[in-house]
């Protein structure tokens, strides 16, 4: 039976409707897949950025913490240095005061003469040279000459050796020095310093742990800011 034009038109419409439905379903499927992929990619990007932000702030937090530690350490060191400097200044002031007190000893000629006798003999016994030169302040020449005269027989008795001692008449210790003597070998290559300043400095060095202990307590510097 032959198809009429109406039947043909109906079949064409039916086929067109089927194709259109198929196309719509395919388009919806593509849209759904695209949206799914978009959401997956968006989630991945969001997670990546989130991790980057977390990593950034974690690093910043560590940097801030490290800076705080450095600043705290610097502050502690500065405070420690300030305390140590103040202690050193106090000790220097005490030594300065002690040196000023030496002038009182020198001003009493009897006491100073007795001290020079001991300083000269001690220096001779330390140097132990056959010929020695004694140098002093210009204002102490007469006292030192007397001290040398008394020291020579004591030296010879103790060492069983003869010696020659010259009091330097041309070169002297500074007149503003605290006092005492320097004793040289004949070629002046060896020297024993027995000035009042050197004796004070030596005593201060030897007694420094005790001085610090009295002033600041035992091992205070070691315990400071620990």
UniProtKB/Swiss-Prot annotation:
BP-aspect Gene Ontology terms: proton transmembrane transport
GO MF terms held by the record: proton-transporting ATPase activity, rotational mechanism
Coiled coil: none
GO cellular component terms listed in the entry, alphabetical order: acrosomal vesicle; proton-transporting two-sector ATPase complex, catalytic domain
Keywords, alphabetical: Hydrogen ion transport, Ion transport, Transport
Gene3D superfamilies linked to this entry: 6.10.250.1620, ATP synthase, E subunit, C-terminal
Tissues in which the UniProt entry reports expression: Testis specific.
Record SUPFAM superfamilies: V-type ATPase subunit E-like
Subunit structure: V-ATPase is a heteromultimeric enzyme made up of two complexes: the ATP-hydrolytic V1 complex and the proton translocation V0 complex. The V1 complex consists of three catalytic AB heterodimers that form a heterohexamer, three peripheral stalks each consisting of EG heterodimers, one central rotor including subunits D and F, and the regulatory subunits C and H. The proton translocation complex V0 consists of the proton transport subunit a, a ring of proteolipid subunits c9c'', rotary subunit d, subunits e and f, and the accessory subunits ATP6AP1/Ac45 and ATP6AP2/PRR.
HAMAP family (UniProt xref): ATP_synth_E_arch
Family as reported in the entry's similarity comment: Belongs to the V-ATPase E subunit family.
Function: Subunit of the V1 complex of vacuolar(H+)-ATPase (V-ATPase), a multisubunit enzyme composed of a peripheral complex (V1) that hydrolyzes ATP and a membrane integral complex (V0) that translocates protons. V-ATPase is responsible for acidifying and maintaining the pH of intracellular compartments and in some cell types, is targeted to the plasma membrane, where it is responsible for acidifying the extracellular environment.
UniProt name for this protein: V-type proton ATPase subunit E 2
Classification lineage: Eukaryota, Metazoa, Chordata, Craniata, Vertebrata
């Amino acid at each position: 039976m032959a198809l009429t034009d109406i039947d043909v038109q109906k079949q064409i419409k039916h086929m067109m409707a089927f194709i259109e439905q198929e196309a719509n379903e395919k388009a919806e499927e593509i849209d759904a897949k695209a949206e799914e992929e978009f959401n997956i990619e968006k989630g991945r990007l969001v997670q990546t950025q989130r991790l980057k932000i977390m990593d950034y702030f974690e690093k910043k937090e560590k940097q801030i913490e490290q800076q705080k530690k450095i600043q705290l350490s610097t502050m502690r060191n500065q405070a420690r240095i300030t305390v140590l400097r103040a202690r050193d200044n106090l000790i220097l002031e005490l030594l300065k005061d002690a040196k000023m007190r030496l002038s009182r000893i020198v001003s009493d000629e009897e006491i100073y003469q007795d001290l020079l006798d001991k300083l000269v003999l001690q220096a001779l016994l330390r140097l132990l040279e056959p010929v020695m030169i004694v140098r002093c302040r210009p204002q102490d020449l007469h006292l030192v000459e007397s001290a040398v005269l008394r020291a020579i027989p004591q030296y010879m008795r103790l060492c069983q050796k003869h010696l020659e001692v010259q009091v330097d008449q041309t070169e002297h210790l500074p007149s503003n020095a605290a006092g005492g003597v320097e004793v040289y070998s004949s070629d002046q290559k060896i020297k024993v310093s027995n000035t009042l300043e050197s004796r004070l400095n030596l005593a201060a060095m030897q007694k420094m742990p005790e001085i610090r202990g009295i002033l600041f307590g035992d091992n205070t510097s070691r315990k400071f800011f620990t």
